[in-house]
Amino acid sequence: MTQRTAEALDDAAIESFLETQSVGTLSLAKGNESYAVPVAFTFDPDGPDVYFRLGYAPGSRKREFIDATERATFVVAAQTEAGWKSVIARGAPEHRGTVEDLNTHRSADGSMSPADRELAIPFYHVFDAPAETVFALVRLPVDELTGVVEAGPN
């Protein structure tokens, strides 16, 4: 069996990788309990920030975990031609509003704002969503961003 290693990704490689991905895993915590959920996202390298559109259906635990989490971890991983790549982003999640509130966040000069970027988050329907489902926009201001790519044999 061939031994493979991993190499760190630089900022440009991390940004390039995240631009080609649309789903990752958001890990949250409340006390001693953890909660991880696959979510669609968009990445703003200027922050850097990661934006999510989350569905808070009745009985969903995401809202309580977002509210309780002081520091979240978001992981994006994929098999590429070069081998496995992964990026880990960490930060304190914050609510940005509901999808209906987007117009209140637009830049006065009409330039692309974080709210516009949030619109680019794809909707993924995992369940038949009840009519009372509320979608919320969540921002993860990234204070730690790392990435690795699988390297060739030693």
Describe every region a protein language model picked out.
Residues 18, 65-66, 109:
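A generic structural signal for nonpolar/aromatic side chains embedded in well-ordered alpha-helices
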Residues 55, 67-76, 85-94:
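Active-site-adjacent structural patch at catalytic or cofactor/ligand-binding sites
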Residues 1-19:
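Extreme N-terminal tail/first-helix region
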Residues 14, 59-62, 101-105:
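Amphipathic alpha-helical interface surfaces
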Residues 21-57, 74:
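Short beta-strand segments
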Residues 82-154:
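Charged, gly/pro-rich active-site loop segments
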Residues 55-59, 109-112:
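Short, solvent-exposed aromatic-acidic interface loops
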Residues 25-29, 77, 123-129:
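Short helix-to-loop capping/linker segments positioned immediately adjacent to catalytic or ligand/cofactor-binding
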